[in-house]
Amino acid sequence: MSSKLEQLQALLAPVVEALGYQCWGIEFISQGRHSLLRVYIDHANGILIDDCEKVSRQLSGVLDVEDPISVDYTLEVSSPGMDRPLFTIEQYVAHVGDQVKIKLRSPFEGRRNFQGLLRGVEEQDVVVLVDDHEYLLPIDMIDKANIIPRFD
């Protein structure tokens, strides 16, 4: 996680948690002159649009006062959804046995994209089974990882 994301996580997660939600993860996406700050929230009872609005109002106030982002951006508060992104080792561990789609920052063993069964986590490596071949992907090389929802 970059130092900017760590700073945002440290600033925003306590606000989300004080409202009774889990801060699932934070993304900051640079899009030219305008960027996107996306905060994923979760709750045991699920997330409704009213929950997102409530958290967004609180986070907006904190962001206005603390001003941690020097460029123009849009704040988006969202549920992680069924194809939820994975951010932490604990989230990978909780989803062992699920199908995942992983994109790396740079090629590993000749490829950047992996789609398969999340077999486990070994220290700082994510174990993924793709076409009967097991890959140990260093978590710090993962750019993006999402659960592939099952509809059965």
Curated annotation (Swiss-Prot):
SUPFAM superfamilies: YhbC-like, C-terminal domain, YhbC-like, N-terminal domain. GO terms for biological process: ribosomal small subunit assembly; translation. Gene3D superfamilies: Ribosome maturation factor RimP, C-terminal domain, RimP-like superfamily, N-terminal. Keywords: Cytoplasm, Ribosome biogenesis. Transmembrane segments: none annotated. The keyword Cytoplasm applies. It is found in: Cytoplasm. One of its GO terms (cellular component) is cytosol. Belongs to the RimP family. This is Ribosome maturation factor RimP. It comes from Stutzerimonas stutzeri (strain A1501).
